């Protein structure tokens, strides 16, 4: 059984159908990059997996638990940590307190254990000296790295990454991509919506290209950037448009 099973889901916003009878499975391994033009349902798919959006039809199972049952959402959100395009760091808390809040409240972790774990992940993302900093003392890249550390604090089986570098300048983008590349090398499972082709080419094991709420192709990375691009005019057009 796949870790995440998306079963024939449809999601609409008013008259707009964003995901149309959409199905896909994700195993607990590798890095899957979701590509496609804006508005084709990539971010909506991640939000549906995490239970932040409800589906109109179909179902999503995360470790066998249905997102349609609200009682499962706490466990599902622990299983799938999500990092957003716009970082949400509580401004009234320092970095350590931002990282320890959920493990203490949701997992029942003791304060000392949570703080030790927070220091471990801050070191992993290269911010060991920022534990007592607050929101306004951090750059955008630092905030995103802290958001990644906060997601890892819950020991998720997968990270859902929703265009986490799109609001950053090139230098900050590289800071964040370095962390994601390091996590991928450690075997952390990731589902990423991104337009960073360097990340897709360097780290992804699987590429899913979406358009009009459906899967156009679902192939290994090397095949996507090789034979699929050469043979599929639409995908070649998309990659050329974004400068790849």
Where is each model-derived feature located?
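Helix-to-loop junction immediately C-terminal to a conserved catalytic motif
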Residues: 50
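ABC ATPase NBD coupling module
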Residues: 67-81, 111, 226-228
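Conserved signature/switch motifs of ABC ATPase nucleotide-binding domains
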Residues: 133, 154, 186
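Conserved ABC ATPase signature
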Residues: 134-138, 142
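C-terminal boundary and immediately downstream tail of ABC-type ATPase nucleotide-binding domains
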Residues: 216, 221-222, 226-244
């Amino acid at each position: 059984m796949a870790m995440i099973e998306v079963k024939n889901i449809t999601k609409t916003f008013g008259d707009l159908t964003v995901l149309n009878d959409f199905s896909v499975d994700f195993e607990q391994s590798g890095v899957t990059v979701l590509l496609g033009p804006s508005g084709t349902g990539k971010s909506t798919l991640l939000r549906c997996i995490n239970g932040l959006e409800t589906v109109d039809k179909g179902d999503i199972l995360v470790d066998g638990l249905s997102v349609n049952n609200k009682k499962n959402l706490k466990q599902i959100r622990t299983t799938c940590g999500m990092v957003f395009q716009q970082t949400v760091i509580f401004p009234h808390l320092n970095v350590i307190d931002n990282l320890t809040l959920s493990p203490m409240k949701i997992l029942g972790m003791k304060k000392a254990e949570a703080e030790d774990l927070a220091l471990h992940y801050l070191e992993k993302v290269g911010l060991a000296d920022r534990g007592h900093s607050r929101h306004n003392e951090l750059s955008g890249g630092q905030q995103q790295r802290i958001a990644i550390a906060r997601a890892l604090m819950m020991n998720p089986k997968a990270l859902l990454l929703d265009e986490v570098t799109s609001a950053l300048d090139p230098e900050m983008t590289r800071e964040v991509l370095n962390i994601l590349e390091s996590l991928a090398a450690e075997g952390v499972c990731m589902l990423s919506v991104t337009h960073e082709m360097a990340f897709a080419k360097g780290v992804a094991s699987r590429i899913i290209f979406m358009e009009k709420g459906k899967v156009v192709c679902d192939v290994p990375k090397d095949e996507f950037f090789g034979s699929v691009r050469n043979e599929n005019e639409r995908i070649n057009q998309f990659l050329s448009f974004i400068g790849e």
